[in-house]
Amino acid sequence: MRKLLWKIPRDYYRCNQCFGFTLIPKLSPEELNELYSDYYLEDSSNMEAFTDGCSDNWIKKYKLTINYFRTQKLDSKNFLDFGCGVDGYGLQVAKENGLTVSGLEVSAKTRAILRANTNCRIFSPDELQVSSELFDFILLSDVLEHATSPSLILEQAIQHLAENGVLLIQGPLEGTNNFTNLFLRIYSYLTPAKVADFLPYHVSLANQKSIQSLLKTNGLKIEKIRITETWWPAPKTLSSFRALPKVLPQIIAKLLDFSVSYLLPNYGSRFWLVASKNSK
């Protein structure tokens, strides 16, 4: 994969066992605080815009979770959105399905916005750490790819999972073998002098094998898993015709990925799963 330059040169290294990728050198706590600043807070403090924006977006992003909730008895069950983000979609989905809802968020500003917009209890990491409360459902939606240690995140979540509770986990499979990543590897090979300068929000790039290995290592068993294809990260619009030579191969690669995903059920760049504690 292409070298990334953010403050210092960094590379994504592949694990020889699970074939997932990790960004090395890892981000320091100070760099993480800088990275996740007010960027995620733009246009999210307006209650009317927040409410209007949720309806369509949460249905698209949380369709599988919504369908899963419809098969469960949710009376008197509680729910924790572990790393809910400023949009609060996961909180809204759980509230719509009658669950008693709480969230966890690192940023104090984000917590304040979420409390105002959702009327939910939002923990800070320190508050959750000292809490003895257990949850029937814990959601990690697009969280693990941001973590320098996904295993540590899972450990923290499991500490607050009820005995018969389940984890609902979803996110991208950026380390999978597909046409999109093949195009990116070829492009990197043909342009070795170029260095990526995007902000490293995603530092752990998973594939299906690495996700399964991560859960097994942390004493979890997968009850359900769905692999799907999404348009991301291919561009949705063309900024200029000069960009066409680069954009067109990406679009073609993504169309090929969609075509294969219709034929192979475990082919795709996004996962959703339900996991529980392994009693064995």
Sequence positions of predicted segments:
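Generic low-complexity, intrinsically disordered sequence content enriched
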Residues: Y68, K95, G165, N218-G219
